[in-house]
Amino acid sequence: MTNDTDTMPIADYLAQGGKLTSPENVPPRYRGELLRLMSSFVDSELAGSAGFAGAINWAPGIKARIAASRITLEKADHAERVLDLMEGFGTDKALYERAHDWAAREGRDSTLEAKRHGGDMRLSVFHYPLTGWTDAVVMNVLMGLATQHAVGELARCSYQPLAEVLRDILPREKRHMELGLEGLERIGATDEARASVAYWMPRVAETFGPAVSERFEKQRAMGLRHTDNETLRSAWRAEAESVLSPLGLC
């Protein structure tokens, strides 16, 4: 389905659940918000992949090494799929990939607000470094659960090509979380695991954004978002606690 500006204003069309299907029929303000969402996803996947690459050599066995390698590879692939969509809006893909040091991190004890830092659009959680295998596994589980909610939200967006790509990506992102959970079950309720949960829970929670957000309201009016930040965060927190509690980690 495409917009038909001859029959109704684009804002009304989107408010009624209309879908846009190509860069050519996207109005300027919509384009800006859409590119912001896509850039945040691409940058977060690239930063996540680059940061998790180091975990491959921390893996305690062959299966764990394969799992870490798979996560690293597929997150980069997910970034490329959405970056391919951005090319249609004039983004120089080759230049974009080289624009930032995706493995760069701040200090472990840095205090970062949820807003963007540096030149890229990664979520703030991807500015913090991993310290070892247990820490990487805990972060992967918590962020993997968050991704199910956040990307699941965007998979319903009004820009149909992005929604379709994200629906294809979601099962693999879920599998990444499941691989992490398998690793966490093997690690068990150690002091190190509990410390990592305490460290990452508030930082992952911040990725959903402020409880009251003018940007969310703007994106909801465009059909790019549907569920508010606090509702998504609460759903994630409840699911995270249900996963961690049987393991003695919350």
Question: Language-model features: where?
Answer:
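Alpha-helical membrane segments in multi-pass integral membrane proteins
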Residues: 141, 145, 165-177, 200-201
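Alpha-helical bundle segments that constitute or directly flank the non-heme di-iron/ferroxidase center
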Residues: 27-59, 126-157, 233-239
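Extended, helix-rich structural scaffolds rather than catalytic motifs
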Residues: 19-20, 192-250
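Alpha-helical scaffold segments that form or flank carboxylate-/histidine-based iron centers
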Residues: 30-41, 60-78, 132-136, 161-174
